[in-house]
Amino acid sequence: MLRRAGILLRPDEAANLEIADLGLGDLEHVGLQIVVYVNTERCCAKELVLLPRQICPEHRHPPIRDYPGKEETFRCRYGRIYLYVPGPKTTNPHAVIPESRKSNFTVWHEVELNPGDQCTLRPDTPHWFQAGPEGAIVSEFSTKSIDEADVFTDPEIKR
């Protein structure tokens, strides 16, 4: 999918591709693939690769001591992504959630991102997203990423 999107990875980047099933063992439906280009004290850049209809489940990036939490911008590079954030509930959302997990999704304001579209989220904003039927690649640009501090709505998730 990365090649189709015109995104080339160096061998070391490809070797460090993270397959994140989030401890659920259901990667086909829930999880994502992550390429981290840089993650310093001040900035982070990643590619988030999602299979068709794959979900990155609801979570937020809370403050930690004197760090206000991660602010992030998502830019769609390939496919379509449905991003869900606080706001008025979308009447007919595109998301398809496994029935057994629906109670773990609380924000339903849909923002559709197509290639070239982007959306910025403030720290500690609950959000989740799902790829469209062809999968999706999203570039994430953010302040420092501390993935192990993410707070997921689903208590079964282990990061």
Where is each model-derived feature located?
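Conserved double-stranded beta-helix
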Residues: T40-H59
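His/acidic/aromatic-lined binding-pocket segments of jelly-roll/cupin-type domains
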Residues: K46-L48, R65-C76, E110-V111, C119
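Glycine- and acidic-residue-biased ligand/ion/polar-headgroup-sensing regions
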Residues: L51-P52, G69-T91, I97
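Short beta-strand His + acidic residue motifs that chelate non-heme Fe in jelly-roll/DSBH
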Residues: P57-E58, D66, L83-Y84, V111, ...
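Double-stranded beta-helix
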Residues: T90-T106, P126-R159
